[in-house]
Every structure is written in C-alpha cells, then in structure tokens.
Amino acid sequence: METKNILTIGIDYRVVRGGVAAVENVYSTFYQPFNHVATVVDYGTMQKMMVFFKAYIQFWKWMLFHKEIEIVHVHGSSDASFWRKRIFINLAKMFGKKVVFHCHGSEFQRFSAQHRNAVQKTLIKCDCIIALSESWKCWFETTIHHKNVVVIKNVIALPRVKKVKHNNFVLLFLGRLGKRKGIYDLLDVLIKHKTTFEGKVKFLFGGDGDVEQVKEIIKQNGLENIAEFQGWVNGEKKEYLLNLADAFILPSYNEGLPISVLEAMSYSLPVISTTVGGIPEILKNGENGFIMEPGDKDAIYHAVVSLMEDKSLCKDMGKKSF
C-alpha cells in the first residue's frame, strides 16, 4: 500500500518490547514507504531523553522539507506516552496536517479531572481517533465528545504453528508482571490450590515489570514445581512457548485489545481473561475460553480446572479461537 503521504509517530518498534511495538512492526510491512519517527525506547532515562529530542528534530524536518506528508498517524497510549504524543499532535495541526490518533492505552478513565480536560483539548483537535474496541469507541464519544471515532482491532502476523508435545497441562501468561495484568490474582490462586495443581499443571510466566516480587512469591510459597518464570520472551522463544501451551491466561484489570490474547488465539489456544476493554468482543465465555470479572479468583480457578481436566473441551475451545 503506497503511503508516502503518511508520517507515523510511535515507538522504536525494532527494539521496544510489548504490544504497541508488535502492531507497528506489522504496519511497517505493508506501509510503503513506512515513514516513521520513534519518540521513545524502553531503556535508560538518558537514552529516552535523547531519543525524544532526536524525534522532535526529525519531526520538524518532516514538516518543513516533506510537503508530500498530509496525514500524521500517531500511535499513543495513556500516562507518559500521551503527554509525549501531545506535542506532536499540536505541531502537526500547526502545520495544517490531518492527525489520526491511534489509541493503545487502557487507563485514560483514571486521569484526574484536570488531566482529562487536557486530554480532551488535545484529542478534539485530531481528525480521527482509532479505538481498539467498541467499548473504547463509546468512551471517546461520550467522554471526549469526539465525532469521528472508528474501531480498528489490533493486527498480528500469522504464526508458524507446530505444537510441542508434553505431559502436564501448560498454562501460559505473557505480559507485564503487575497488578494491572492480574498476575497477583493468578499467584493467589496457585497458592490456595497448590495441592490441586501439583503434578498436573505447569504455569509459565513471561514478561517484565515486578519480576523480583513474582519470583519471591513463587519461592516463599514453594511453587517452583508448578510455576516457572521465563523472563521477557519474544521471537523464537515466544513462538516455542505458544506452541507448547495448552491454554493462555491474562486476568487483567485494564486493557485496550491485548496483542498477547490475539497471538494466543492465532495459535488456537483457549483463553482465560476478563471483561475489560475489547476482550469481550473477541472472547466468548464457554466458546473459545472463559471470561470473568477482574479479581474473581474463584472463577479463575474453575476455568483452569475445567480446561485441565477436559482435554476435549480445551481442544474444541482452541479451534474456535482461531
């Protein structure tokens, strides 16, 4: 697709971890050319400052010397990401460009009233907002009062599926380790039902964030035989784990439309997740997985046991995921 009139503002998708990087990487394969300015990397405060300053200079060059640019496609999230991207949105409008804000964030509703006003003043300038789900589309329309919000669900590259044979039931978690992704709820379930899972289930955790805290909980509660931390995984290692897993779990409290869930579904895995963001639009309870309210640990337990004890159910749900 010829896109010489589009400038994309995002992250350094070649080195940054996470879902937004994965989305931008896919876009880079069919935008021709992929005009791109990276505003952030995910390592070192000084490096982040240098990358942002470089991005600011690059953006001015694009605006001043590339008159063919008509549309600025801004990939942004909530928190610090939004405040960085706000600068580029305002500059793009100053140069008379059309701006598309592609929202990957899941915590805009937690902004204070003062910050929410700043968000509204910025986003109302955008010619279009891309939301990841109908629920987020509704939020932008009713809270930000934007009149041109469209839903484009996240995209992923199709995987190479080659299942790995194993004995125990394997449940996979991929995501940032912390409260928002529900990792502590899952650990509480493992602790409470340790005897049920021992010798039957292997829980594999992959991600960054509260790494040491999670490791310590596993060690203190003697979960080493059923829970195994994989570190940050991508590339071939992630492909291997998704081929190894029997099911995927992400008991989040806030989400847009998580790439990890889409990737798991592309590997024909049943998914255990929660009723947040765009997840209910792709996950149907009892069909391609189980879905529950955030924090419902009993529901998490029963979902895991249902898949663990019924291989036919697990396989059938997985087929319906893809």
Where are these regions (language model features)?
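Conserved donor-binding/catalytic core segment of Leloir-type glycosyltransferases
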Residues: 7-9, 163-192, 203-206
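Nucleotide-activated donor-binding/catalytic signature segment of Leloir-type glycosyltransferases, i.e.
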Residues: 215-233
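Aromatic "clamp/platform" in nucleotide-sugar-dependent glycosyltransferases that forms part
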Residues: 253
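Donor nucleotide-sugar binding/catalytic pocket of nucleotide-sugar-dependent glycosyltransferases
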Residues: 124-160
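A short, well-ordered alpha-helix in the C-terminal region of glycosyltransferases
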Residues: 299, 306, 313-322
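Glycosyltransferase donor-sugar binding loop
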Residues: 40-41, 174, 202-215, 231-232
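Short hydrophobic beta-strand element within catalytic cores of glycosyltransferases
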Residues: 270-273
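Conserved acidic donor-binding segment of nucleotide-sugar-dependent glycosyltransferases
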Residues: 285-286, 290-297, 306-311
